[in-house]
């Protein structure tokens, strides 16, 4: 006998839903635009004390508003706003976590039902066709640039950190593309 039949029904529904593919997961190149965002870091302080705005890209990793970007896109900001292709106004975001060593940051916007990208789980090897998605050159125009993986793991020096084990590729990355996803033909 069940003490709480409502709870039992909810549990059954949840386990059935886990077997179904989430409709918010992007599964093709045409829909990647719905998971990629333009990020504005507000109130950055430069070496002379002036305030400036930093701009970069990012992408949803869950339907409940979590976004991955590069740490250098949001580092030192006093506030972060996210622009999408499906809203007219910027959405305020909060910084959840950062890693200077990996040049990664996680930010979050309120809401749910966002389209998002799944992680690529297959082998990465030289010659793999890839695409860099984002909003380059501080514009509001989304771009998708193609290339191939040229080296599976590379180390590099940047002006903001030493970065280890990144994917070396031939897709053009312009200022503003930072933080955007590198994806395959299935949007992963």
Predicted regions and their residues:
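Conserved active-site neighborhood of the chymotrypsin/trypsin-like protease fold
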Residues: 36, 44-45, 62-142
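A structural connector/turn signal
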Residues: 24-27, 56, 118-119, 168, ...
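Solvent-exposed, acidic/flexible segments
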Residues: 18, 22, 32, 51-54, ...
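Glycine-centered flexibility sites
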Residues: 54-58, 65, 97, 127, ...
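Extracytoplasmic/secreted proteins, especially bacterial periplasmic and envelope-associated proteins
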Residues: 24-27, 31, 119, 126, ...
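Active-site region of chymotrypsin-like
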Residues: 32-51, 90, 108-116, 142-188
């Amino acid at each position: 006998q069940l003490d709480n039949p409502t709870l039992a029904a909810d549990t059954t529904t949840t386990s059935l839903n886990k077997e179904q593919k989430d409709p918010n997961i992007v599964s093709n190149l045409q829909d990647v635009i719905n998971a990629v965002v333009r990020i504005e870091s507000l109130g950055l302080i430069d070496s002379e004390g002036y305030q400036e705005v930093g701009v970069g890209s990012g992408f949803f990793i869950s339907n409940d508003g979590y976004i991955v970007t590069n740490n250098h896109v949001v580092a030192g900001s006093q506030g972060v706003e996210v622009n999408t292709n499906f809203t007219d106004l910027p959405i305020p975001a909060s910084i959840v976590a950062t890693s200077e060593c990996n040049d990664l940051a996680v930010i979050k916007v309120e809401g749910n039902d966002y389209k998002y990208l799944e992680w690529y789980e297959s082998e990465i090897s030289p010659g793999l066709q890839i695409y860099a998605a984002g909003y380059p050159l501080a514009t509001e125009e989304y771009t998708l640039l193609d290339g191939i993986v040229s080296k599976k793991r590379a180390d590099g020096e940047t002006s903001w950190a030493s970065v280890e084990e990144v994917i070396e590729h031939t897709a053009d990355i312009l200022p503003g593309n930072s933080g955007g996803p590198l994806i395959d033909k299935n949007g992963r």
